[in-house]
Amino acid sequence: MELWTSATPNGWKVSIMIEELIDAGAELGNTTVKHINLAKGEQHSPEFLTHNPNAKIPVLIDGDRSIMESCAILQYLGEKYPTSLLPDDNSRWDILPWVYWQAANVGPVFGNKLSYTRYMDAVEDEAKAHPLKRFGNEALRLVGVLEDQLNKHPWVAGNTFTIADIALYPWIRGWKWSKVDITQTPAVMDWVTRVRQRPGVGRGIAYGVPADEVDRWSPERRAQYRRNGAQITNPGK
């Protein structure tokens, strides 16, 4: 298998999944990782577009099959290598709705909040006020939904760590960067800590990141991400 990815929340979902599958005893065989430089536009290259016409990371190439969309990749890997991450019985339907919830709600809302918070310095504050309020309020509402779920049981979909946790964690862990205050949701805060303590998660979020910056970026790295994000958000500017 080949994973074409970058150090972003959606990219980290799949790298975490690979590492968690390894820890669960799945025999993945040889897996190679190709890091895509988003700032240089490598996702728009003809080679990349052959595998994902939507020009987004991550992409998983497994034999003659190319799979786009991070949550689809999670499900594909979970079905190909059955473990407790995605059981092959009806309990999967306690898990998959939360994966889709992440893709349809948390990712877009947190992504937009992040863009207006960090990547649109050229936009006047007055023009950003409404989207910042809208996406900020909706992000807090979604965190509240997650808080209610985690008050019922230790993991998102029940008593076991699954792909639902993997799908959500990379976005929630960046709450400071997106300026979504989760400190008033103690179950979510505790969950973030517990997920981070998993060895597979630690290895997964280290893909494409210097070892000493996995949990705290240097000022130079933060500035680089701001520049890269602004370039991607406002192409041609």
Over which residues does each language-model region extend?
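Residue-level recognition of oxygen-bearing side chains
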Residues: 72, 187, 200
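Charged/polar, low-hydrophobicity segments characteristic of intrinsically disordered regions
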Residues: 139, 198-215
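Short, hydrophobic secondary-structure boundary micro-motifs
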Residues: 84-88, 109-112, 155-159, 202-206
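Short, solvent-exposed turn/loop segments enriched in Gly/Ser/Thr/Pro and often Arg
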Residues: 37, 163, 208-211
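GST-like fold's C-terminal all-alpha helical module
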Residues: 98, 102-197, 237
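Acidic/histidine-enriched, glycine/proline-rich intrinsically disordered or flexible terminal extensions
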Residues: 208-237
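Active-site-flanking alpha-helical
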Residues: 78, 171-172, 205
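GST-like domain detector, emphasizing the conserved glutathione-binding G-site
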Residues: 1-133, 222, 232-237
